[in-house]
């Protein structure tokens, strides 16, 4: 069977930063991309086809130039987290008011697993993080959704 004829599945996660910290370690959230093995009767291969991130956020203040990057990283086979998607965000506020930004990005991964035994979950660890380039702080917030597209071949 070709991957195009295989079962399609999505895995969606939400990440919410009520305020962006000046400490980058506080701006990381871990999300797993999972295909459950429960109820499966035969071995399967899993293809992580793509990862898409969509987000919006806001900031407040007067004469503020805000810039940052949203990173989506995936755990590589050697155990290290490596970025696969980097999306810039930001804006400039002239008056003492609230300002909004939004963005999205998508990457085609095509990461295939070996055969996974029935009843065993397949997963890939991912990390969503924010990098502060300029003025991202407690006056900024961001909400993000990450959608992983999977193909399952039995």
From Swiss-Prot:
Putative nuclear shuttle protein. It is found in: Host nucleus; Host cytoplasm. It comes from Banana bunchy top virus (isolate Autralia). It comes from the Viruses. Belongs to the nanoviridae nuclear shuttle protein family. Keywords: Host cytoplasm, Host nucleus. InterPro entries: Nanovirus_C8 (IPR008706). This is Putative nuclear shuttle protein. One of its GO terms (cellular component) is host cell cytoplasm.
């Amino acid at each position: 069977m070709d991957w195009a004829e295989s079962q399609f599945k999505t895995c969606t996660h939400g990440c919410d930063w009520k305020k962006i910290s000046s400490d980058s370690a506080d701006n990381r959230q871990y999300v797993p991309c999972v295909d459950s093995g429960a109820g499966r009767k035969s071995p399967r291969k899993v293809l992580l086809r793509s990862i898409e991130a969509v987000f919006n956020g806001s900031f407040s203040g007067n004469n503020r130039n805000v810039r940052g990057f949203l990173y989506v990283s995936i755990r590589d086979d050697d155990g290290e987290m490596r970025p696969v998607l980097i999306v810039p965000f930001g804006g400039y506020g002239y008056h003492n008011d609230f300002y909004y930004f939004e963005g999205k990005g998508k990457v085609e991964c095509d990461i295939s697993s070996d055969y996974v035994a029935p009843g065993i979950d397949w997963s890939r660890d991912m990390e969503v993080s924010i990098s502060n380039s300029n003025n991202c702080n407690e006056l900024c917030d961001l909400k993000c959704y990450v959608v992983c597209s999977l193909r399952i071949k039995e």
